[in-house]
Curated annotation (Swiss-Prot):
It comes from Homo sapiens (Human). Pfam families: Filament (PF00038). This is Keratin-like protein KRT222. GO terms for molecular function: structural molecule activity. GO terms for cellular component: intermediate filament. Belongs to the intermediate filament family.
Length: 295
């Protein structure tokens, strides 16, 4: 009895101990599980908060990007409108420039035609000038030959002999300076005078721009001073408005050459002297009347 009772008591204690251990094990396991669950929940909460914060930041950035996109769309629309307006503006300017270019091209063609016409006229004038220069040279050569023939074989000037008078005129186009030469005589008071006067006038558009008069003759040596004074007086007598200071007078004295076929000079007398009086005036001086020519 006592042994079975003791065994029952031991069994009961053991069951109590076993039950207590099981309860403690279960409790410790539950506590551990609760702690693990709590830690996991804390971590999940932190992760959730972080995810919410990240989501919030993402939403904020998305909103900012939406605003920026709308702003960029507005800028794009503004740029498109500006581009369209600029295209229209420059298209109008291009049309205006094309019109101006067409006008300038027409003017250029007209200028080229005018230049070609002027070149043709200039060439014609040059040809005319060259032809007239040849004619002038021919007439000058004829006059020089006539002068050499006249002065080479005649003994001095005689009262009953008068020097020949000739007049040569050239009519050129109005754009070219005309040169008119005419020959006249100077009054003679001495037997041995042989005098001829040549006047040249340069005319531009009907106005005298330059004039020169040249008197040429062979006189006796002892009468040089008197003849020169007489010639000078005759120039200013025909032109009372002409002042002596406004013209340029120059006297050239040369020993007259004696031709073998002409009159021989005497050794006792002084040789005759060739005298040339040259008078020039410019366009700023009053006009000189051309000497009267013999018919």
């Amino acid at each position: 009895m006592e042994l079975s009772q003791l065994l029952n008591e031991i069994r009961a204690n053991y069951e109590k101990i076993l039950t207590r251990n099981q309860i403690e094990t279960v409790l410790s396991t539950r506590i551990q599980l609760e702690e693990d669950i709590s830690k996991k929940m804390d971590k999940d909460e932190e992760a959730l908060k972080a995810a919410q914060a990240e989501l919030k930041e993402a939403r904020r950035q998305w909103h900012h990007l939406q605003v920026e996109i709308e702003s960029l769309h507005a800028v794009e629309r503004g740029l498109e409108n500006s581009l369209h307006a600029s295209e229209q503006h420059y298209q109008m300017q291009l049309q205006d420039l094309e019109t101006v270019i067409e006008g300038l091209e027409k003017e250029l063609q007209e200028v080229r035609r005018g230049i070609e016409k002027q070149l043709q006229e200039h060439e014609m004038l040059l040809n005319t000038k060259m032809r007239l220069e040849q004619e002038i040279a021919t007439y000058r050569h004829l006059l020089e030959k006539e002068e050499i023939r006249y002065y080479g074989c005649i003994q001095g000037g005689k009262k009953d002999k008068k020097p020949t008078t000739s007049r040569v005129g050239f009519v050129l186009p109005s754009a070219i300076i005309n040169e008119i030469s005419f020959t006249t005589k100077v009054p003679q008071k001495y037997e041995n005078e042989n005098v001829e006067t040549v006047t040249k006038q340069a005319i531009l558009n009907g106005s005298i721009v330059k004039e020169s008069t040249e008197a040429h003759g062979t006189i006796q040596t002892e009468k040089v001073d008197e003849v020169i004074k007489e010639w000078e007086g005759s120039f200013f007598k025909d032109n009372p408005r002409l002042r002596k200071k406004s013209v340029s007078l120059r006297f050239d004295l040369h020993l007259a050459a004696t031709d073998e076929g002409c009159l021989e000079t005497k050794q006792d007398n002084l040789p005759d002297i060739e005298v040339r009086l040259i008078m020039r005036r410019s366009c700023s001086i009053p006009s000189i009347k051309p000497p009267s020519t013999a018919n």
